[in-house]
Amino acid sequence: QKKMAEMESAGFQREKLVELYHREMDEWLQQFDARDPGFKDGVPQWRSALQTGNEWKLMELPAYWETRGLNFDGTVWFQKEVEIPADWNGKEISFHLAMIDDDDITYFNGKEIGRTSGCNTMRTYKISAALAKAGKGVITIRAIDYGGEGGIHGEPQQMYMEANGKKISLAGNWNYHTGVSMTGAPSRPLSPEGTGWPTSCYPTVLYNAMIHPFTVFPIKGAIWYQGENNVGFDEQYRVLFQSMITDWRRAW
């Protein structure tokens, strides 16, 4: 009801709703990041030097972290020390990091080199020739999983760094440290853009995409199979189902 009221106040204009979503998401991320031990006063603390200590553990990547025994929704920081070959000095370097579920921010030697949203999107980030220095370097990835499986996943051959016609694998052991858990976090804002948190949850999306286009055709009835992922909200269906059928009869 709150979201519908917001949509009505925006005149159901997509541009205004997208703008509202980005404002809400910025506020949500500020609150979320404030609880992350990897941040201090809004500044990432684990992005540069290789971190040490008993709280940092090893994980073999790529893999969903649940398959490595980490049952966790939230942020996980990953680090790996790499050796930049002498013949890569002053050459643009590409980092291929397979896929990351759900979102990530990636750093090299403390400098952000890219960020991506989307659990099934291949990550490829580059550092300029000016930043490419021979010797040791540190890749830091802050992965955010909002629910379900999380982690840096894919095939080992999809994790590597590349420059000067040569590839070096990045698969294998990475250091990791959990950040902030989704447990107790406020609900993430819904996106009207078709990205981010499942757009199918956004009011009007399923109806406009899957029901309304068929109202131009005559029908005798409807039969459907129902699956559920929100059994804890069963009481809502006493009202929702009746309202849905009433609306279908009106539409046809």
Question: Residue spans of the language-model regions?
Answer:
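Aromatic-lined ligand-binding clefts that engage carbohydrates, nucleic acids, or primary amines
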Residues: 46, 56, 82, 88-110, ...
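An acidic-aromatic loop/edge-strand motif
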Residues: 1-67, 119, 133-208, 212-214
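Solvent-exposed beta-strand/loop surfaces of large extracellular or lumenal domains
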Residues: 61, 66-68, 101, 105-125
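Secondary-structure transition/capping motifs at alpha-helix termini
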Residues: 85-89, 131-133, 247-252
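Active-site neighborhood of glycoside hydrolase catalytic domains
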Residues: 201-252
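Solvent-exposed loop/turn segments at secondary-structure junctions
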Residues: 101, 113, 145-147, 227-232
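A surface-exposed beta-strand-loop module
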Residues: 124-135
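Short beta-strands within extracellular/lumenal beta-sheet-rich domains
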Residues: 72-85, 123-125, 208
